[in-house]
Amino acid sequence: MIKLIENSWQEGVAKNITFIVTKDCQLACKYCYLVGKNEKERMSWEVAKSAIDYILEHEIDFKEESVIWDFIGGEPFLEIELIDKICDYLKIEMYRRGHHWFNSFRFSFSTNGINYDSDKVQKFIKKNHNHLSIGITIDGTQKKHDLNRIWKGNGKERGSYEDVVRNIPLWLSQFPNAGTKVTISSADIPYIKESVLHLYSLRIHEVNINVVFEDVWKEGDDALFEQQLIELADEIIDNGWFQDYACSFFQESIGKPIDTSIDNQNWCGAGKMLAVDAAGNFYPCTRFAAYSLRSKKPIIIGNVHDGIDENKLRPFLALDRTTQSPQECINCEVASGCAWCQGENYDAANTSTVYQRATAICKMHKARVRANNYYWNKLFQKLEEEGKREEFESKHKQTNQEPC
């Protein structure tokens, strides 16, 4: 009756382990936080194998009942041969060791979609389909997508929309419930409404969309953002899109006060996740690797040879809402759903601390909340007029927006 954003696989019980297989990408997206992309740092098989062996040998230290083996870049599918070898080895070793993750694992990818239809990628998908989660990033209309997601190369920059959209039908035929990720920066706010509706027209039923955490926002962006979301709300409700399609900007649970005595968890999973790069270094999250940071030094918590240094990891395990948020955020009447990224917090802080929450999206969150209230008020009024409000309430318990 109403399509809602679905929880991710094994949310809250899965360990996320990320292989940074390459720092190269075909694109040079203008809003990309990866400031140190390059063609040289590619993960070797020896480093990947050492990381796997360390993790599986220390099963007692990884007690989560499930695991998500995540592959990122750059563009991960540039290293499809290495990834295929890694995944084969993981399956063999988890089985051989009788590891508790063998019956509960996923291989996860976020890709630009450009070489999705290549023979090697398709062979890999066919072999591992039942354990795959693949998201293709398409930013909306061609105008919005090509505004930011451009091919790299001095004098060669051009939009990548046509190179991506051609693979959407194939992707959806293989993963019909897959969602896409959309990123909003200041320049493309005017295209939000038409872009979400365009993605719906491509039969992408779940659009996970967010504003960038960096301090890029201009005076008046929040008002324009709110207006775009209200216009989008009208289109979704008036044309019945809400029945089969979902946009993460509209969530019933956001925009409420938070009682930190009950809900004091960290929004971000940094420290509970684990990332490994081409040099074999471990990080609490990919955002703490050097290629993700504008002004701070990377935070390395170990390596594939010496293991994880618990003392370096400890500060991340103590993170929660109150230890890093200014009092204004804790007292905010619309605090729920206001997100943060631990890596951006660290990079934007005026000292080398992970306990200083960046608040660049404050006005944007409040604008989203106002539009979100408009959306749900209008939708509930429509449901009541049609006698369907009670049916909705009985089928859909209120869910919190998922932290990363």
Give the location of each predicted region.
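Canonical Radical SAM [4Fe-4S] cluster-binding loop centered on the CxxxCxxC motif
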Residues: E11-E46
